[in-house]
Each structure stands twice: as structure tokens, then as C-alpha cells.
Swiss-Prot record:
Residues 637-653, 678-704 have a biased composition (Basic and acidic residues). The lineage of its organism: Eukaryota, Metazoa, Chordata, Craniata, Vertebrata. This is Zinc finger protein GLI3. Transmembrane segments: none annotated. GO terms for biological process: positive regulation of DNA-templated transcription; regulation of transcription by RNA polymerase II; smoothened signaling pathway. Has a dual function as a transcriptional activator and a repressor of the sonic hedgehog (Shh) pathway, and may play a role in limb development. May bind to the minimal GLI-consensus sequence 5'-GGGTGGTC-3'. Has an essential role in the early embryonic patterning of mesoderm and neuroectoderm. Residues 1335-1350 have a biased composition (Low complexity). The keyword Cell division does not apply. It is found in: Nucleus; Cytoplasm. The keyword Phosphoprotein applies.
Length: 1569
């Protein structure tokens, strides 16, 4: 051949050249000719048409005159055909190689056959590829799709005759680009068959490229497979030449001619050529310049035979490069078309310009051992190819059995390890094997063993043993790492001709033969004969040894096959475009086809976490995703480095076991790919692998599922299904759970998840700290720290002192969730160094104030807080915590993380009770005003919007506003007042109480319940007089209220609660009350705040109440006195501020209670009445109206001399009459009860009103109201048999202490008793008093005192006469709360009630403080009973909780229900406080029929219409009050005096409508006129 080429003369060459140039007609060239042509793509061989058999086609003497007629577009034959034809190819002889007259553009040098070098002045006869431009430069033009190709005439092809006969050089291009251009080495012509490397390479090349791609592309590039490795060219020279070519026209212009310039024949040829190169038909090694990270498009341009390059370019500007580079469109060049890439299209296209010089030996190794199929040798992508002998395995032609997969060449594991040692490429993350992965995310793409490839693991040099070409090939299956045909099963050495036969043999003879033992006995299997759990697992495992890949891609043009079905499924997503794995980071919509990619994305993009740690001893590498880790393990540590199953369970997560041979990591090093044989890529079966693949990492649920979180299946981001990007099946890479390592101990996280609502747990004391320091989560903490820094910029002092670990609370087990909080709660070490600084509690409180605010917390880390958790507070994040229970020794969840909202890892946003520390100020203990201040401070600190102004704020005096906005009163450590009493007093024991009883929710009977769940109201008889939900004033030491406050009626409409209301006022009420109290110093009267009409109305109403109450009290003092055996101690303990209960205050409070509540500042959850609330949600007006309605738990012991001595005297006298002992007590009571008498500020007048009301004015509110308002006095008069209820911590009153003589002696006790009992007392007074009195008689009957008072009382009660104690009256009126004459039910219920009371009385002193069954107790006692039970229920163990539990309770309860039904008369139901608000003064008396509305519920439920939304139908209000699902805890419904429906009402609305409501409020006031 070489001689012949030399023999041609220059003149001949010129002649031939001319003829070629002039020849315009094109001979018809079949696809086969094109495929086999070694010349330009547009081989214009003037000779005969070429046939598929290259030898013949190329051997045919080209005839210059003939033009290429038509090119058949039939796709190239299958790999099988190609394989069979490879050796049949003959090159037509090239007779003349005309000497180039002029160098082609840029300098296209024709190869001088004499020396194999390009001589610019030597023009081949063929002018071989004048039409080919220099290789396509990979530059911006390509990426932008702006590279245009200019087709040029194709000269006739002249092939030297010698070449034609040489089977050795079928595909060799005829010119070689060499910077040398040195003809001196003419003797070295590579075309010389004797060339030492030609034969091996040619055979190999032919076997690899039976299609024209090799010859055409190689020639097109001016690069001959033989020439490249030629010893005459140095890497530097070759690279230099490549560089020269890079600037010239691309030889592909002819292959991909522009439509305009390319003739139809040319286009056909090009298309044909492309189809021939199509991966499905002509799989070729794929050398991806840079594997793309992008998912593939669902459509594949090559799937259609009519592939249109222009269309592809138009569709994806970067697609051209993708095609050329076989890349899935790298990140730089997006627009990839799925698995299609240049390499997929043609091996020729795979020949990227190798930036790195490739030495002959390197080339040899690459080709032979790596099977990069020439593509690697002539690597397309310079950046990826490296001179290192180990080139990333490129795709071998799947159909060519002779072609060994890069992996097939199983260089011994050691070799593999060496070669695999991170050739930069293999080390390059996700630049996986150039041939195998085009960075395609489908790991399996590389895995297909070429069917014909023999397992070359034995070849020491990486020389692949090519078995007879193509006999064994699985036509479309890509080259596998292993193509085993010999059985290496223990004791079996059978050899088979095909892999299929081997597989069949193994399955039938070995696997099924050992039916009960699923053990791989393959020699050298890394599983070490560990049995599989199931047969299918073993079957799948064996594919690793045999290289079988039964799962083939069904998409046209894709020849990928996988050994595992899940890998195929993942791969198919590259075709379908399905991306089921969506980034879990909120706001990020990226989706991925596999979980591994998502994990990688999340960990790289949204965090710096690298949870996947290499477990190989001494290796400290960490990765963001399992695929990268697997790749690292395979690449760096070798195939044998995979972790065995036994390691999986270890604390130390094992490194991911190497992928199955078919699923190699993206950049699998060549040696590693041989793992299929040696290393057990899938040491586990699917199941195992699944387990492994899950990586057992449970990403911490960050606040918004931001950081790497478990994939949809709960698996960690590492998903079993291999992500196309991660080219390896997720073998089980386990997250390093070592606290010292990667992600820290996630088990710890699982136990104590980072609190969602907490602020960065590590940086601020605001969050509960995980039980362990999780080093692995430090990144999370860092994120939170960054987040906090932003906030801290605004909150510089945000809890500057980290929470002390020493005082950490014991695990709260109340909910079964144990959270060790570092937050110092209770009186623990001051967590809040500066009271002016927002503490964690403060922040918590702020968040709790935002009832609906699941996301309000700006502090809560976007990463670490659950979006669902409302608060940043570790403790009170429950956005609707119905009760922040105190920690005063009670077992309650600090942050009921699991209580009710399993979604939130932190505190349940609706936890019915977030516990609060006893003594530490908490939101729950704040008054609305304080809350407002806190919110304002928080807003100022965080730059947030100011809080919604308090109701009536516009009417508040400047002083009051300043007080609201000013710092809280002397709180010990924070702006928040200390918690003296439970928020709802549901805890029973206030911080000051020496002891308290278990709350219903603490008992199993009550259990934890969702705040919104209705609660069977407990009779409050056991509770310490329930205090305001926020304990607003209870926890605050209010300023002294000057005596002048005669009628400090809070003019906030319908504040109808007394200080001692068993159902403490809601926040709304507290707000108003707080404001008033804060102004108390200024002695602002209602007149200061309310319109004259309102004031007048309130005054008139109060007068009536005073009178009624006074009368009742006087009448019943003596009898009631007997029940009083309270010790001043408990009273004192209850006393939060004696001063606070000045007469004015009482009056103020009461009047305040009469006003409608508008303040909706806090979430309903915070205002909820704890489970101890009245069973029916009825709020007994008596209690509500009690002067101490807000201070139910406050046994304020007023030692102040009553301002209204007269009323006291009257009451005293009255008591005296009924109870000889009463005088002293009464005196004390009255003295002490400035609270009621003085506070009422009305003295006699008030009593008179009460008397009038209770005795004669059933219309006034049927004593239910008078009891509500008057029983304060009456109970005063009746210091209460409820004296039994020792409501204080010192509630140690017991049956033994029933001595009434002591009662007489305990003067203050009466007051205290009265004060404490005010709430319960009213109930007792209204319901239980009879029974209690009798109980006093019964239990304390030994005491004549008791007997006297009690008897007199009972007798009067039984008489049913007008002289009946107000109890009977109250009970009747209460029963008839609907406004009906109390005798209606009196006849029926009173005697019955009395009986019941008698029965229950017996239980009075037997009450077990622990027995919180009061909820089930009859609300028989109805509102009063309920109030009573609610108040007593926790207040004293001694007080008979069981009073409410008598066997006859059901009947009483029925009565209550009846009453309730009466009360719920829709015609009378109006918005809370409707009784006061809209009715005119005239209506009030008659309309105050005790309409029962869940006042607190409505008030606290911010979802209702605006605060003053105009007239609402009573039924609506009723529904709101009783049925509001928003209510965290049903409150006792307020029994409001009925008001004609016609009158307009106020409804509690959203805070958002507060402004509007304020405006409407004025309107309402106007209406009042």
C-alpha cells in the first residue's frame, strides 16, 4: 500500500485531483459504503457504489466521473452485523494522492502516505477531505449554536490499491495531521502494514468501528487511529495539531451540512451517516467532554431516523456541542437531549480533540484496556482526557462483542485500583467514565458489557481479550463491565459460548439447585457466601458476576441495559423527563429523576452539609450525595472497598457498596469497572441495596424541609433508584451517624429533633437543644446562626446568654415526648439576663401571641424550624397551646412536640398545653397590655410591623398607653411578669400555692387533648379559682388602685367577669382590664374611657347588682359563714396583690366584665380555658362579674378598711343574724373584703343592688346575674360554706379542720375564703352552697357554728321562701338563667338539687385532690355549679370535688342542660357581652337572662368577624361560642343576660379587622345611646 502510494507521481496526483474536483456527479453510495468509508463523510468516490462490505466497497476502484447518486438512508446494521463485517472490510486502493495545490482553509494538510505526516504541499490524489473543515472547535459558538458549517465540494475518492487489499487498514483515514509535516520520516508511514501497531489497532478498531464513523471522522479530523498512536508524533505535537485544527472549519460541516449549502445527496449522506452512527445502531464509545448534570429531555432527536441537526440546534443552542461531546449538555451547555450525545450518535463524534497529548502507549492502554473505543484514544473532550493510562471508561460499542467494555477489561482489582486511581477524569465528580457516562445521570449507561467482550479481568495489561467478534454480542446491550461466559461457581468450571447460557446454567443449576440456601458461591465473591434473604436477591446478585443486564431500555435509539430493574426505571426517566424527586427546600422547585440527585442538589445548593462520609479507614472524604460517595469509593478505594452488609448495621455507616457492575458510578475508573467480577458492586440484593441505598440517613426535618430530607418515601435523599446522574445504583451508603463525624448522631436527632420552632439551637438560647451535641448538624446550626445574625442585627441582645445547660428542665414526658430543654424555665437560673432584652420566653410569647401565625416567627430559622411550627419558642411554639401549663412540679410537656401535631418536630402548634415554668414570666402570665408591650418590643427589635393596638387604645389616656408600651412592671428577669398562676389556673397550683391538685388534663381521664377539641368541662369546684387565661393581672403586681375607683367599670364592652371569675377573662378582657389597671394610678374612671351613655348604663346596672347582691349577702351571711374555715395562709398565698383588690379595682373589674370583649390579640389557643373549664362552656356571670373575675385564683386578702363601711356593716349584720360567729368573721371579711365591698366602691348601694337583684329581680339576670355580680357580696355575706374549699396552696382545710370555731377565729380566712371562693363561691352559693352548707353541717356538724349557720341557711333554702338564701335564689335564677322566673326550675330543681347537694355534701370533704373527675360532674349545677367546680376543682383538695359527683349528678346535670338549653335561647344569644353592650339601659334588667355564650371562646377566637361587626344573629354567636372549632379549649360559656335580638351586637373578629372594629366600636357606643 505504502509503496503504491509512493509510486504515484505528482503529476498523476494533480491529474486525479483535477478530475476529482471537476467531478460533479456523485456516485450512489449505500449507507454501508458511507459507514465503511475511510475517507470524508461525503466520500465522493468517482468509482462504483460502495457496498456494505467495506472491503469490496472500498476496494472498488473509484471512478471519478461518477457522482454519488443517492445515499440510502437505511440505518447502519446492528452491532452484530457490524461485528461480523468488521473484518470483511476492504479499503479501496488509493491510486493517486494528488498533491495539494493550495492548502485548504486554515491549513488542511493532506496526509503524505509516504510518511504518514501531513505535508502542506503534498496533496493526496483524493484530496481526501477537502470538504472537511478542521475539527469543530468547542467554543462559545458551538455552545450557542451559532457555528455554521459550509459544505464544500467533495473530491473523488481515490484509495491506494495497496490499501484496498489490506484488511488491516479498513478504516484508516488517509492523511494524518502532524505538526511535524516532516516528510523525512517517510519510511515511517503508518500505512505500512508492517507498522508495529497497525495490526493490533486495526483489528481492534475495526471491531469497534465497523461503521464509517471511525474512518470518516478520523479522516475528517485528519487523524488516523493508526497515526495518532504513531511513534512519530509526540503528545505535544499532536495536541498542537489539534489546536491548529481547532480554529479551522469543522470537518463535520460535511457530516452536518447546513441545509442551504448541502445538496440533497449530501444531506442524505449526512443523515445516513448519522443514523449509522446512531447509538442504537451504531453504539460507540462515548467520550463525554463533560457529563452533564442536567436531566435529559424526554425526546431524543436521534430516536427518529430523520435526525435534523438544524432542528436540534434550534431547539437547543447548546445541543450541537452536546452531540459532539456526547454530553447530556453539561451545565455550561444545556439543552441536552437525554441520553443522546455526540458519543451516542457516533464514536467518530466522540473523538473530541484531546487537549492532552496522548502517547502511543497511553493510547494503546486506553484503547486496549479501557476500551474507550478509539473514542478514548482520540478523546473528544480535552478536559476529560488525560494522558494517564487510565482513561475514564467510555461507552464501548454495546453490540460489538469483540469490543471489551472498559470495564470488561477487568484489569485485576489491583490494576483496576491503580488505573482507577483517580485519573483526573475518574476523580472528577460526575464526570464519569467518558465513554460510559456522558455525565448522564443514568448510571447504568456505562454498565452494559459489550456482549462480545470477554471478561478480560485476566488480562494483566488490560489487554482485552476480544472473543470472536460479535458472536456473543447482545445486539443492543451496551458493553458491560463483565461479560462472563465461564461458570466460576464453587466446584463448577463449565464454559459456555454465551452469557445467556451461563446465566441459565447458574439460575437452574446453582441457584435453583440450592433452593433453601441463597448463597453466592462464586469464586472470589465479596459477599463471602453470606446468604440472601430471598432467591431473587441472589439472582440479581449473580448478574454482577455474569454481567447480565436483562433490563434493556425500550426507547428507540437507546441501547442501555441494566442488571437491576430499578436502574432501568431511573434511566427511563431520562427519556420520559419524569422527575419525581422534588427539592424539599421551600421555594425551590427543582425536580430530579432520582433521589440521589436531589440529595446532591439539596446538600450542595441549600446547605453545605456533606452527610455521606467515606468509611474507609483513614479516609476523611465527605460527600453531599450517595452517588458521589460511591464513586469515590470505587474510584479511590477500588471495587473491593465496598462495604459489606454486616457493616451496614454498624454505628459507622459503611461506605456505599460499589454499584452493581451495570450501575457504576458516573466516573468509574477503568479498573473499577471490572469490579463486576472482582468487586461486588451489589453485594446485596435489591432489598439489601434498597436498604443501603436509603443510606439510613434521616435528614433532620428542617424548618422547611430544606436541608437534605428524606425523599418522599422517607428515605434519605439517597434514593434507591439510581439517579441518572449518579451512575451507580445506590448501594447502601450510610450516613455517618457518628456524632464526631458527618451529620452527628442522627439517632439523637430522631429522639430530639431540632426544635422546629426554635431559633438556631446552637446560637441562641431560644431553642431547645438536641439532647446531644450533633456535630453533624453544625452546618444546620451555622445556617441558623446566619439566619439569627440577620435577626440579631435587629435583636442584638436576643438572649445574649445562652441557656444554661445546668438548669435544663427534666424531660417532659407528659406527651410521651421527652424534650430536654436547655431553656431555664421556672425559677431556674435566669435565662433572661436583662429584662429589657427579649428572652427566649419573650420571643416565645410573642410567637404565641400570633395565634394564626404558623410562620410569624422571623427568628425561627428557615432551615431548622418547621414551617408548621408557629413559634420560635422552644417552649411555647404551639400556636394554639390551649394552656401553657406551669412547670410548678407538674408533669407537662414543655413543648409538646408530638402532642398533637406530628408534623411539627417541635412544639405542636396546637398543643393544648405548652407548659410554662412556674415563676418565670411567660406569655401566659402576661396581661394583654404586657403582651402588647412585648409584641411592640419584639416588633421594634425585629423591625416587624407594630402590634395591633389594644382595644379602646385610642381612648386610653396617654399614661395608660405609655404604661402599655413601657417596660413591664418589675419583672424579675424579663419584660414578662413572673408566672404566679397558671395561665388558666388550669394548673391549679399557682406558683405561690403551696400545693395544687392535678389538673384534669394531667389525669389520664383527661389526657392531653388538642386545644381545639372540646373538653368536658370540669366543675370548677376543685380548681383554684381559675384565673385569666393569661393570668393577666394575677401574675402582675398591679399598681395600687386608688379607692376612688368607685365604678371603674371597664368600658370595654361586655367585660362581664369578676376578678374571681372561675372562667378568667380572656385576653381581650385582660387587655382592657390591664389598661384600666395600669391607669389606676391616674384614677381614670370609666367616664374617662367610655361615652356617658355607656357609663350611665354600667352604673345603673351595677347599682342593681349591688343592691341585689347586698340583700342576698345579708340574708345568707350567717348560714354561709359556717362553711368558712379558710386559712388566711392560703388566702395570702393567693394574694398576688392585696392592693390590687381595692374596692375600685373590684368595681372596675366587675364593670369591665360587663363590657364586650374586643381584644383579640392573642391566639385563641392562649386564651383557652384549660380542660378545667366549665363543662358546658358556660361561664357563670356571677363569677364573671365577680370583682375578682380576673383574679379568680388570687385570694386577695384585703386588709384595707372597707371604704363602704355601711355595706360591710350591713353584710356583717346580715351575717351576724344568720351566724353568730359571723360578726367577727364578717367584720374581717368586710374589712378584708374591701375587695368586694370597697372595690365595688359602692358599699351599701352595691349590696342593695345585689339584694334587689338577687331577691327580687329575677329579671335582672335571675340571680344568675345577681349571683354573678352580687354574689360577690352575697358570698361575702356567705363567706361560703365553700370555706371548705381551701383554695390556696395552703388549702389544707380538711374534714378534720372542719371546726367552724376556727372559722370564726380566722377572720381573714373568711375574706380570703370569700375572695378565693368568689368564683367557686358563687357556684357554691348558687349550687353547692346548699350542699356545702349541709356538708358543713354533716362533716363539720360537730361544730355548732357550722350547724347553725348551715341549718339556717339550708332551712331557708329548703323553705324556698323569699328568705331562701341567695343560693337557692341564685340557683333558681341560675337555673332560670334564660330570664324565666327562677321558680320555674326552682320547684323542680331546687329540692332535687338540694337532695343532690345533700348527697354530694357528704363527699365534700372526701374529695381527693387528685380526683379530677369534675369535668364529668354535673354541670347539673349548671353555670354556677360549673363555675364552682371550675374554681374549686383545683383549688383545694379539701373542697369536695365530688360534690359535683354525687350519684344524682346526672339529674342535676340534666337540669343544667335544661338550663343551658334555656340559656341558649337563640333569641337571647348575642355576642359576648351582648348583655351589656348593645342593650340600652332599659333593656338590661329584663334581658340579662343569662344568655350563655362561649364568651372567652369567641373573644379569643380571632377568626370571627370584626370585633364589632354589627348585629350578629344570636345563633351565630352561639355557634361561635360553642362550636368554634378554632377554640382550643371550650370555655365556660358566658351566661350573658339576654338582650333583644334587635339590638346590635358586637362580634369578636380577627385582629386584622381590629382597626375597623375600633371604628365600629365608636359606632357601637353611639348605638348605646
Amino acid at each position: 500500500m505504502e509503496a503504491q502510494s509512493r509510486s504515484t507521481t505528482a503529476s498523476e496526483k494533480k491529474k486525479v485531483e483535477n478530475s476529482i474536483v471537476k467531478g460533479h456527479s456523485r456516485t450512489e453510495v449505500s449507507e454501508k459504503a458511507v459507514a465503511s468509508s475511510t475517507t470524508s463523510n461525503e466520500d465522493e468516490s468517482p468509482g462504483q457504489t460502495y457496498h456494505r462490505e467495506r472491503r469490496n466497497a472500498i476496494a472498488m476502484q473509484p471512478q471519478g466521473g461518477q457522482g454519488l447518486g443517492k445515499i440510502s438512508e437505511e440505518p447502519s446494521t446492528s452491532s452484530e452485523e457490524r461485528a461480523s463485517l468488521i473484518k470483511k472490510e476492504l479499503h479501496g486502493s488509493i491510486t493517486h494522492l494528488p498533491e495539494p495545490s493550495v492548502p485548504y482553509r486554515g491549513t488542511v494538510f493532506a496526509m503524505d502516505p509516504r510518511n504518514g505526516y501531513i505535508d502542506p504541499h503534498y496533496r493526496s490524489d483524493l484530496d481526501l477531505f477537502p470538504a472537511f473543515h478542521p475539527p469543530v472547535p468547542i467554543d462559545a459558538r458551538h455552545h450557542e449554536g451559532r457555528y455554521h458549517y459550509e459544505p464544500t465540494p467533495i473530491p473523488p475518492l481515490h484509495v491506494p490499491t495497496a490499501l484496498a487489499s489490506s484488511p488491516t487498514y479498513p478504516d484508516l483515514p488517509f492523511f494524518r495531521i502532524s505538526p511535524h509535516r516532516n516528510p523525512a520520516s517517510a519510511s515511517d508511514s503508518p500505512f505500512s502494514p508492517p507498522h508495529p501497531y497497525i495490526s493490533p489497532y486495526m483489528d481492534y478498531i475495526r471491531s469497534l468501528h465497523s461503521s464509517p464513523s471511525l474512518s470518516m471522522i478520523s479522516a475528517a479530523r485528519g487523524l488516523s487511529p493508526t497515526d495518532v498512536p504513531h511513534a512519530g508524533i509526540s503528545p505535544a505535537e499532536y495536541y498542537h495539531q489539534m489546536a491548529l485544527l481547532a480554529g479551522q472549519r469543522s470537518p463535520y460541516a460535511d457530516i452536518f451540512p447546513s441545509p442551504a449549502t448541502a445538496g440533497a445527496g449530501a444531506n442524505a449522506l449526512h443523515m445516513e451517516y448519522l443514523h449509522a452512527m446512531e447509538s442504537s445502531r451504531f453504539s460507540s464509545p462515548r467520550l463525554s467532554a463533560r457529563p452533564s448534570r442536567k436531566r435529559t429531555l424526554s425526546i431524543s432527536p436521534l430516536s427518529d431516523h430523520s435526525f435534523d441537526l438544524q432542528t436540534m440546534i434550534r431547539n437547543s443552542p447548546n445541543s450541537l456541542v452536546t452531540i459532539l461531546n456526547n454530553s447530556r449538555s453539561s451545565s455550561s451547555a444545556s439543552g441536552s437531549y437525554g441520553h443522546l450525545a455526540a458519543s451516542a450518535i457516533s464514536p467518530a463524534l466522540n473523538f473530541a480533540y484531546q487537549p492532552t497529548p496522548v502517547s502511543l502507549q497511553q493510547m494503546h492502554q486506553q484503547i486496549m484496556s479501557r476500551q474507550h473505543s478509539i473514542g478514548s484514544a482520540f478523546g473528544h473532550s480535552p478536559p476529560l482526557l488525560h494522558p494517564a493510562p487510565t482513561f475514564p471508561s467510555q461507552r464501548t460499542i454495546p453490540g460489538i462483542p469483540s469490543v471489551l467494555n472498559p470495564v470488561q477489561v477487568s484489569i485485576g482489582p489491583s490494576e483496576a485500583a491503580q488505573q482507577n486511581k483517580p485519573t483526573s477524569e475518574s476523580a472528577v465528580s460526575s464526570t464519569g467514565d467518558l465513554l460510559h457516562n456522558k455525565r448522564s445521570k443514568v448510571k447504568p449507561e456505562e454498565d452494559h458489557p459489550s456482549p462480545g467482550a470477554v471478561c478480560i479481568q485476566d488480562q494483566p495489561d488490560g489487554m482485552t481479550l476480544v472473543k470472536e467478534e460479535g458472536v456473543k454480542d447482545e445486539s443492543k446491550q451496551e458493553a458491560e463491565v463483565v461479560y462472563e461466559t465461564n461458570c466460576h461457581w464453587e466446584g463448577c468450571s463449565r464454559e459456555f459460548d454465551t452469557q445467556e447460557q451461563l446465566v441459565h446454567h447458574i439460575n437452574n443449576d446453582h441457584i435453583h439447585g440450592e433452593k433453601k440456601e441463597f448463597v453466592c458461591r462464586w469464586l472470589d465473591c465479596s459477599r463471602e457466601q453470606k446468604p440472601f434473604k430471598a432467591q431473587y436477591m441472589l439472582v440479581v446478585h449473580m448478574r454482577r458476576h455474569t454481567g447480565e443486564k436483562p433490563h434493556k431500555c425500550t426507547f428507540e435509539g437507546c441501547s442501555k441495559a441494566y442488571s437491576r430493574l430499578e436502574n432501568l426505571k431511573t434511566h427511563l426517566r431520562s427519556h420520559t423527563g419524569e422527575k419525581p424527586y422534588v427539592c424539599e427546600h421551600e421555594g425551590c422547585n427543582k425536580a430530579f429523576s432520582n433521589a440521589s440527585d436531589r440529595a446532591k442538589h439539596q446538600n450542595r445548593t441549600h446547605s453545605n452539609e456533606k452527610p455521606y462520609v467515606c468509611k474507609i479507614p483513614g479516609c476523611t472524604k465527605r460527600y453531599t450525595d450517595p452517588s458521589s460517595l460511591r464513586k469515590h469509593v470505587k474510584t479511590v478505594h477500588g471495587p473491593e472497598a465496598h462495604v459489606t452488609k454486616k457493616q451496614r448495621g454498624d454505628i459507622h455507616p459503611r461506605p456505599p457498596p460499589p454499584r452493581e457492575p451495570g450501575s457504576h458510578s458516573q466516573s468509574r475508573s477503568p479498573g473499577q469497572q471490572t469490579q463486576g467480577i472482582h468487586g461486588e458492586h451489589k453485594d446485596l440484593s435489591n432489598t439489601t441495596s434498597k436498604h443501603e441505598e436509603c443510606l439510613q440517613v434521616r435528614s433532620v426535618k428542617t424548618e422547611k424541609p430544606m436541608s437534605s430530607q428524606p425523599s418522599p418515601g422517607g428515605k434519605s435523599s439517597c434514593s434507591r433508584q439510581q439517579s441518572p446522574i449518579s451512575n451507580y445504583t445506590n448501594s447502601g451508603i450510610e450516613l455517618n451517624l457518628n456524632s464526631g463525624g458527618s451529620i452527628g448522631d442522627f439517632s439523637a436527632l430522631d429522639e430530639t429533633p431540632i426544635m422546629d420552632s426554635t431559633i438556631s439551637t446552637a446560637t441562641t438560647g431560644l431553642g431547645l437543644h438536641g439532647r446531644r451535641v450533633m456535630t453533624g448538624t453544625k452546618w444546620m446550626e451555622q445556617i441558623k446562626v446566619e439566619k439569627m445574625k440577620q435577626v440579631n442585627g435587629m435583636l442584638p441582645r436576643l438572649n445574649p446568654v445562652p441557656p444554661h445547660r445546668a438548669p435544663t428542665l427534666p424531660p417532659i414526658t407528659g406527651n410521651g415526648v421527652q424534650l430536654n430543654s436547655n431553656i431555664s424555665l421556672g425559677g431556674l437560673a435566669p435565662v433572661l439576663p436583662n429584662r429589657n432584652d427579649l428572652s427566649s420566653m419573650d420571643i416565645t410569647v410573642l410567637n404565641m401571641l400570633n395565634r394564626r401565625d404558623s410562620n410569624t416567627s422571623t427568628i425561627s430559622s428557615a432551615y431548622m424550624s418547621s414551617r408548621r411550627s408557629s413559634g420560635i419558642s422552644p417552649c411555647f411554639s404551639s400556636r394554639r397551646s390551649s394552656e401553657a401549663s406551669q412547670f410548678e412540679g407538674r408533669v407537662q410537656n414543655l413543648s409538646v412536640a408530638g402532642s398533637y401535631d406530628p408534623i411539627s418536630t417541635d412544639a405542636s402548634r396546637r398543643s393544648s398545653e405548652t407548659s410554662q415554668c412556674d415563676g418565670l414570666p411567660t406569655l401566659l402570665s402576661l396581661t394583654p397590655a404586657q403582651q402588647y408591650r412585648l409584641k411592640a418590643k419584639y416588633a421594634a427589635a425585629t423591625g416587624g410591623p407594630p402590634p395591633t393596638p389594644l382595644p379602646n387604645m385610642e381612648r386610653m389616656s396617654l399614661k395608660t398607653r405609655m404604661a402599655l408600651l413601657g417596660d413591664s412592671r418589675d419583672c424579675r428577669l424579663s419584660p414578662l411578669p413572673s408566672v404566679n398562676v397558671p395561665r388558666r389556673c388550669s394548673d391549679g397550683g399557682v406558683g405561690s400555692y403551696g400545693r395544687r391538685h392535678l389538673l384534669p388534663n394531667e389525669l389520664q381521664v383527661n389526657g392531653m387533648r388538642r386545644a381545639s377539641d372540646p373538653v368536658k368541662m370540669v366543675s370548677d369546684n376543685v380548681s383554684n379559682t381559675r384565673v385569666v387565661r393569661f393570668n393577666s393581672l394575677n401574675n402582675v403586681i398591679p399598681p395600687d388602685v386608688p379607692p376612688p375607683m368607685e365604678r371603674r367599670n371597664l368600658s370595654l364592652q361586655n367585660y362581664t367577669r369578676n376578678v374571681y371569675s372561675p372562667c378568667p377573662p380572656s385576653i381581650s378582657e385582660n387587655v382592657a382590664l390591664e389598661a384600666m389597671i395600669m391607669e389606676a394610678e391616674g384614677n381614670f374612671d370609666d367616664e374617662d374611657l367610655l361615652p356617658d351613655d355607656m357609663v350611665q348604663y354600667l352604673n345603673s346596672r351595677n347599682q342593681r347588682l349591688y343592691e341585689t347582691i347586698e340583700t342576698d349577702a345579708l340574708q345568707n351571711n350567717a348560714g354561709e359563714r359556717n362553711g368558712n374555715n379558710f386559712e388566711q395562709s392560703h388566702v395570702t398565698s393567693n394574694v398576688i396583690n392585696e392592693q390590687f383588690h381595692s374596692s375600685e379595682q373590684t368595681d372596675l373589674i366587675e364593670n369591665k366584665n360587663d363590657l364586650p370583649i374586643q381584644w383579640n390579640e392573642v391566639s385563641s389557643g392562649s386564651a383557652e380555658y384549660s380542660p378545667s373549664r366549665l363543662k358546658y362552656g358556660q361561664r357563670f356571670p356571677t363569677q364573671q362579674n365577680q370583682p375578682f373575675g380576673l383574679y379568680n385564683n388570687m385570694m386577695v386578702q384585703q386588709q384595707n378598711v372597707p371604704k363602704s363601711g355601711l355595706s360591710q356593716q350591713r353584710g356583717y349584720q346580715h351575717h351576724t343574724q344568720n351566724n353568730p360567729q359571723a360578726p367577727q368573721q364578717n367584720l374581717d371579711l368586710y374589712n378584708n373584703s374591701n375587695v368586694w365591698s370597697g372595690q365595688l366602691g359602692r358599699g351599701n348601694q352595691y349590696i342593695d343592688d345585689i339584694e334587689r337583684s338577687s331577691l327580687g329581680h329575677s329579671a335582672t339576670g335571675s340571680l344568675c346575674n345577681s349571683a354573678a355580680r352580687g354574689q360577690k357580696l352575697t358570698t361575702n355575706g356567705l363567706p361560703m360554706n365553700t370555706g371548705q374549699q381551701n383554695f390556696g396552696p395552703s388549702t389544707h382545710y380538711s374534714v378534720q379542720s372542719a371546726n367552724r370555731a376556727e372559722v370564726v377565729q380566722n377572720e381573714n380566712i373568711i375574706n380570703q375564703e370569700f375572695m378565693q371562693q368568689m368564683t367557686a363561691e358563687h357556684l357554691i352559693y348558687g349550687m353547692h352552697l346548699l350542699g356545702v352548707t349541709r356538708s358543713n353541717q354533716t362533716t363539720s356538724g360537730q361544730n355548732g357554728n357550722t350547724t347553725d349557720g348551715t341549718r339556717s341557711f339550708l332551712s331557708t333554702t329548703q323553705n324556698g321562701g323569699e328568705q331562701q338564701p341567695t343560693l337557692a335564689k341564685n340557683f333558681q335564677s341560675f337555673v332560670n338563667s334564660s330570664g324565666n322566673s327562677r321558680q320555674n326550675l326552682h320547684r323542680n330543681n331546687l329540692p332535687y338539687l338540694q337532695e343532690q347537694i345533700y348527697d354530694t355534701n357528704q363527699h365534700i370533704f372526701k374529695v381527693n385532690s387528685i380526683k379530677m373527675e369534675m369535668q364529668s360532674h354535673p354541670q347539673q349545677h349548671c353555670a354556677n355549679a360549673q363555675n364552682f367546680s371550675g374554681q374549686l376543682y383545683d383549688q383545694t383538695a379539701t373542697y369536695p370535688q365530688q360534690i359535683m359527683k354525687s350519684g344524682s349528678e346526672p339529674g342535676m346535670e340534666a337540669n343544667c342542660l335544661l338550663q343551658e338549653s334555656n340559656n341558649t335561647n337563640s333569641s337571647k344569644l348575642l355576642s359576648p357581652g351582648a348583655n351589656h353592650v348593645t342593650s340600652t339601659v332599659d333593656n338590661i334588667d329584663n334581658s340579662l337572662a343569662g344568655v350563655q355564650i362561649a364568651f372567652a371562646a369567641i373573644i379569643d377566637d380571632g377568626d370571627h368577624a370584626s370585633l364589632i361587626s354589627g348585629v350578629l344573629s344570636p345563633s351565630i354567636i352561639q355557634n361561635l361560642s360553642r362550636n368554634s372549632s378554632r377554640l382550643t379549649t371550650p370555655r365556660a360559656s358566658l351566661t350573658f343576660p339576654a338582650i333583644p335580638v334587635s339590638t346590635s351586637n358586637m362580634a369578636i373578629g380577627d385582629m386584622s379587622s381590629l382597626l375597623t372594629s375600633l371604628a365600629e366600636e365608636s359606632k357601637f357606643l353611639a348605638i348605646m345611646q
